Amino acid sequence: MNKKLKVMTVLGTRPEIIRLSEVIKKLDQYFNHTLVHTGQNYDHELNQIFFHDLGLKKPDIFLEVSTSSALESIGQIISKIEIHLDTIKPDAFLVLGDTNSCLAAIAAKKKKIPIFHMEAGNRCFDQRVPEETNRKIVDHISDINLTYSDIARDYLLSEGMPPDRVIRTGSPISEVLQAHNTEISESMILETLSLTKFSYYLVSLHREENVDSKENIQKIGELLNAISAKFNLPVLVSLHPRTKKSLTLNKVKLDKNILLHKPFGFIDYIALQINSKATLSDSGTINEESSILNFPALNLRNAHERPEGMEEAAVMMTGLSLSKIMQGLKILASQQRADSRTIYPVKDYSYNNVSEKIPRIILSYIDYVNSNLWKK
């Protein structure tokens, strides 16, 4: 028979869309592939523009999950995906990362569908971070865990995962950046915003632990104003709705040199990072992107889940400490760019064939999971 395997992929946030973009194209090519969007943040700025920028088809299914509360969203994700699992009956189920969307895997587990989890094994060891709980749950219910690094693989093995079900694939982000290199280099976003290369700071902050408390959002306002005052340069802030809401609610006052902007598309945001004097972010992707593209960056978190990035010191971690941020920016000012780089790329972030690996792994392990775990 020439029947194609049925694979279902679930996503719901920008990082998932970006990282999965090249994988999705391969899954569309080789399998009967269903792409499900949980509806978490599906609007033009947060999601739709990324599908356009990355050349992806519109999702086949929208769960239209409410985001009124995290627990309500999680409940809806699990209950709504169940309907489509029963209808489509996929042979395999793929998720990436640690967002609430990944918890759709709980429904797949109940249906005894083989679960493949990309970006498995990441740990920040900070229980205040909501994603830490998510990633532990998804790792431990997944059948095949696909890690970016040996460190992540070792974490899973130390937690009792069977070695034959943990596979290091490397990060998919380098392949995505390479696929869109021409578009990134041709971006006109600096001209559009009247910015000069290496003469502005780029900031992106959205994590719950950073922006949801009054104390921290006030700190963020103070550090933005301090950077603007010290260097007399524009500070461009890519404004996530969560951050915008907190700034408004807490009446944070910002200097005129602080430029608040709605979230950028993938192409323009990468171009802004490359051409910034430095990028300050609490994003999970900052370690990888700064390592691959060699732009100066600070990670504004107190804990992170990518220690392999620190082995090459690709990014410095400062939290929201103004004194550490200022010292960090001073160090970054001497960072060599382009071919003269002295901060070397992290090997685990440099793979350009992850999208080829994933379909092969899925094809190889569906029967293995069914026979060895579910005794089908």
Language-model-derived ranges and their functions:
Residues 29-59:
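N-terminal glycine-rich anion-binding loop in soluble enzyme alpha/beta folds
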Residues 95-96, 102, 117-118, 145, ...:
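A donor-sugar binding/catalytic signature common to diverse glycosyltransferases
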